[in-house]
């Protein structure tokens, strides 16, 4: 549209989206102006563009334009100025005497070097006003100031300094984009690096074909063209007829790298970038030529590049892919490796044969076969959008993998299979640990429900519980000491009856499993209860008679010293059958063989002292009360209860006595191995149980008289029994935890809890009050200790 842009093909000075596009270059004309790229002026046309005048024609054809005086090479205008006024960015405005000759050059690459070797002052990489830290806006390159972090004067605000001056992170995506910063040919790397969009096509073709073939490229050279209007004709012909690309000799390459001393400093920095952008074949040929030859070579190279670009447009337009698509696959730094230095590598022969460019292997599947990519990259946001889309595609793929692997919690980009497996194992381990913790918590909650043991989470809670236990134990002991003789006898008898009722639920299943007809016999006492009631009455009366017989031969004593041993008491009397005393208890019962022995012992013990303390002694028969209480609960017709078994008795001894029994269970009265034992004898039939009960009158086991009674059912105590079981369990489980603090009081607490089971239940509200009173006493102590531990801990860490 107007101005002759070698690659634009319309677009009115804009880089034209590759053949009549909307005026925006897909690779670097992002801001709308190719501005200074390949020597074009900031206005969007090439500033004379090889001699064209500002109106878009070749204005003097290499220097014949109004502003393009060929000058004398010393007078401020480049002798090969190519028109456009002040070289129009073609190698910098005010070439300034060409390498320091003019006052502006100043010999120090100073004021108006004016984009020398790099286009207009806006062109990043020119060595003029904003170039290489010698201008106003150059960043950190060679002491420059202002905004360019990498410096080199390669644009106003680009972090890498690769061209455009509009905040482009990659350079070459902003306005006045120059892919190769610091090159002497407008916006090309090292004067030869940047090849605009046609070069982009070559970037796809050349390296990939080289990888495919693995053969060196054929080298072609082109004779130097004259500075006449032939350039215009050549370029016009090249639009119609593709010509083979041509290259200069190796000596031209060497002279470009070995410039004057001042130029070498600038070139070194440019070479550092060009080395990062593309691997180059370094050749050392020590040849120095005139500066005019260098300019001629540059012009020839630019002509060749333009011709190659035009040929590439005709050849590879249908299948061309923009580097932006490729660059979206890579990071910002990785795209530098995809640039191709066409001046260092010969053009492949396949280009002449019009072979289609090899598409990018990673992205071929994303474009349909018949689709021609129409891309419009205005700025970096387009490229970033593509990168975001690729990241989203990767996320979607990983989310699909997550569906196959439910243990994975969050998508992770670019995660290997080993990492995924590792994450799954960790997650599964975490889930297993969580399940184990939940099971442990459930078990603990069940234990708490059964035992009602409060959780001890801190030292304060432990102290509170200790105080509560001691208060309960002391209350039980006080109540025991204040009891009368009658109450103590009732407690003992009730303990026996309670133990008679134990394990009955476990006995019933065993009986039903072993004998099929037993179930009916068990039901008969409740259904047809005539004989059972008559038997029950006789049983109760028989049990009462046996108790009276036992009590007539027994003495009740109390106020026994806790440290006194049983032998100290039994050694004072004769005819003793058994001494029933709980460990370290201050009371007990002496059972004698005959009533006469009991009376003699009463006289002796009432006058005796144990460890300096007198005993309280009395008969049990006259003190026995409420015989009806023993007949309130229904009996178990299949089970007998035996009390006061000697410590040496075992299951074999009882089995020899009760041969018709089906199950024998021996219990220790107070949980101590050497204490008096109690047993439950289960029979298969009611007749067997009745026969065993009848024969057990005056029964001796290991030469000790024992009491034999019927066991009782638990039906009437279903609601009361759990409370009794819960109270001792609370105290017994907490006492071992306190053992480290008060080992001497353990036995006392256990004994007192067993002795006063019913009293503790009745006085539970009182115990709660005691616990509440103890709390304010224990809390201040714990609060005083905690700060001390913290202070010492901090000191140790410091």
UniProtKB/Swiss-Prot annotation:
Q: Where is the composition biased (Basic residues)?
A: 783-798
Q: Where is the composition biased (Polar residues)?
A: 328-350
Check the record and name the Pfam families matching this protein: RRM_1 (PF00076)
The record's keywords, sorted A to Z, are: Nucleus, RNA-binding
Q: Which SMART domains match?
A: RRM (SM00360)
Q: Which domain of life is it from?
A: Eukaryota
Under the heading PROSITE patterns, the entry gives:
RRM (PS50102)
Q: Is Plastid found in the keyword set? A: no
The record's Gene Ontology cellular component field reads:
nucleolus
Tell me where it resides.
Nucleus, Nucleolus
Where does the protein principally reside?
nucleus
Recorded phenotype for the gene knockout or disruption = Deletion has minimal effects on fertility and embryonic viability, but results in delayed somatic development. Exhibits a 37% decrease in the number of progeny per worm in a Brix domain-containing lpd-6 mutant background.
Q: Where is the composition biased (Acidic residues)?
A: 196-205, 226-242, 258-278, 287-317, 378-404, 424-450, 478-504, 743-762
Q: How does it assemble?
A: Identified in an mRNP granule complex containing untranslated mRNAs.
Its biological purpose is as follows: Nucleolin is the major nucleolar protein of growing eukaryotic cells. It is found associated with intranucleolar chromatin and pre-ribosomal particles. It induces chromatin decondensation by binding to histone H1. It is thought to play a role in pre-rRNA transcription and ribosome assembly. May play a role in the process of transcriptional elongation. Involved in phase separation into sub-nucleolar condensates.
Q: What is this protein called?
A: Nucleolin homolog 1
Which species is this UniProt entry from? Answer: Caenorhabditis elegans
Query: Which gene underlies this protein?
Result: nucl-1
């Amino acid at each position: 549209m107007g101005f002759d842009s070698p690659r634009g093909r319309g677009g009115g000075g804009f880089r034209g989206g590759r053949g009549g596009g909307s005026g925006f270059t897909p690779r670097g004309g992002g801001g709308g102006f190719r501005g200074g790229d390949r020597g074009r002026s900031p206005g969007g046309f090439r500033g004379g563009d090889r001699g064209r005048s500002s109106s878009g024609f070749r204005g003097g054809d290499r220097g014949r334009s109004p502003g393009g005086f060929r000058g004398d090479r010393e007078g401020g205008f480049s002798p090969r100025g190519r028109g456009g006024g002040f070289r129009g960015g073609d190698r910098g405005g005010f070439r300034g005497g060409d390498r320091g000759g003019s006052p502006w050059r100043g010999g120090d690459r100073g004021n108006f070097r004016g984009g020398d070797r790099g286009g207009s002052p806006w062109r990043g990489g020119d060595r003029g006003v904003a170039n290489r830290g010698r201008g106003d806006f150059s960043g950190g390159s060679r002491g420059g100031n202002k905004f360019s972090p990498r410096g080199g004067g390669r644009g106003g605000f680009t972090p890498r300094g690769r061209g455009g001056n509009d905040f482009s992170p990659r350079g070459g995506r902003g306005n006045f984009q120059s892919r190769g910063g610091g090159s002497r040919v407008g916006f090309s790397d090292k004067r030869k690096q940047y090849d605009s969009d046609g070069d982009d096509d070559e970037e796809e073709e050349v390296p990939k074909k080289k990888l495919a073939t693995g053969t060196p490229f054929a080298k072609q050279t082109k004779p130097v063209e004259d500075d006449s209007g032939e350039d215009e004709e050549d370029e016009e012909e090249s639009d119609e007829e593709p010509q083979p690309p041509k290259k200069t000799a190796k000596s031209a390459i060497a002279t470009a790298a070995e410039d004057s001393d001042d130029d070498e400093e600038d070139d070194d920095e440019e070479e550092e970038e060009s080395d990062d952008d593309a691997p180059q074949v370094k050749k050392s040929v020590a040849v120095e030529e005139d500066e005019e030859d260098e300019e001629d070579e540059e012009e020839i190279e630019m002509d060749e590049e333009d011709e190659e670009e035009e040929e590439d447009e005709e050849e590879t337009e249908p299948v061309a892919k923009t580097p932006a698509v490729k660059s979206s696959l890579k990071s910002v730094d990785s795209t530098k490796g995809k640039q191709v230095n066409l001046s260092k590598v010969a053009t492949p022969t396949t280009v002449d044969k019009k072979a289609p460019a090899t598409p990018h292997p990673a992205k071929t599947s994303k474009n349909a076969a018949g689709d021609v990519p129409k891309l419009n990259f205005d700025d970096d946001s387009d490229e970033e959008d593509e990168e975001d889309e690729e990241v989203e595609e990767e996320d979607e793929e990983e989310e699909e993998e997550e569906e196959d692997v439910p243990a994975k919690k969050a998508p992770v980009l670019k995660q290997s299979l080993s990492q995924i497996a590792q994450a799954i194992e960790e997650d599964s381990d975490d889930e297993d640990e969580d399940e184990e913790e939940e099971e442990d918590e459930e078990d603990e909650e069940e234990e708490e429900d059964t035992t009602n043991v409060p959780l001890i989470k801190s030292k304060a809670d432990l102290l509170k519980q200790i105080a509560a236990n001691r208060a309960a134990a002391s209350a039980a002991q006080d109540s025991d000491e204040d009891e009368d003789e009658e109450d103590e006898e009732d407690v003992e008898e009730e303990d026996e009856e309670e133990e008679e009722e134990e394990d009955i639920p476990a006995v019933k299943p065993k009986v039903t499993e072993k004998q099929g007809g037993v179930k009916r016999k068990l039901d008969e006492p409740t259904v047809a209860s005539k004989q059972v009631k008559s038997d029950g009455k006789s049983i109760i009366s028989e049990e009462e008679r046996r108790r009276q017989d036992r009590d007539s031969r027994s003495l009740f004593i109390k106020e026994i010293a806790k440290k006194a041993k049983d032998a100290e008491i039994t050694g004072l009397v004769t005819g003793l059958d058994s001494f029933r005393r709980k460990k370290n208890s201050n009371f007990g019962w002496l059972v004698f063989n005959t009533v006469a022995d009991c009376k003699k012992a009463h006289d002796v013990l009432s006058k005796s002292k144990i460890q300096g303390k007198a005993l309280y002694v009395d008969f049990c028969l006259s003190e026995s009360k409420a015989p009806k209480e023993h007949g309130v609960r229904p009996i178990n017709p299949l089970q007998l209860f035996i009390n006061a078994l000697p410590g040496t008795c075992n299951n074999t001894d009882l089995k020899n006595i009760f041969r018709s029994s089906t199950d024998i269970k021996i219990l220790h009265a107070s949980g101590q191995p050497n204490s008096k034992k109690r047993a439950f004898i289960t029979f298969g039939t009611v007749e067997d149980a009745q026969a065993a009960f009848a024969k057990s009158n005056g029964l001796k086991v290991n030469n000790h008289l024992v009491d034999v009674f019927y066991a009782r059912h638990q039906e009437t105590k279903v609601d009361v029994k759990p409370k009794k079981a819960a109270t001792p369990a609370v105290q017994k489980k907490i006492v071992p935890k306190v053992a480290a603090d008060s080992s001497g009081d353990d036995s006392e607490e256990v004994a007192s809890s067993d002795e006063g089971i019913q009293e503790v239940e009745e006085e539970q509200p009182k115990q709660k009050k005691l616990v509440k009173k103890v709390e304010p006493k224990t809390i201040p102590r714990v609060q005083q200790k905690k700060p001390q531990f913290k202070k010492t801990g901090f000191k140790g860490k410091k």
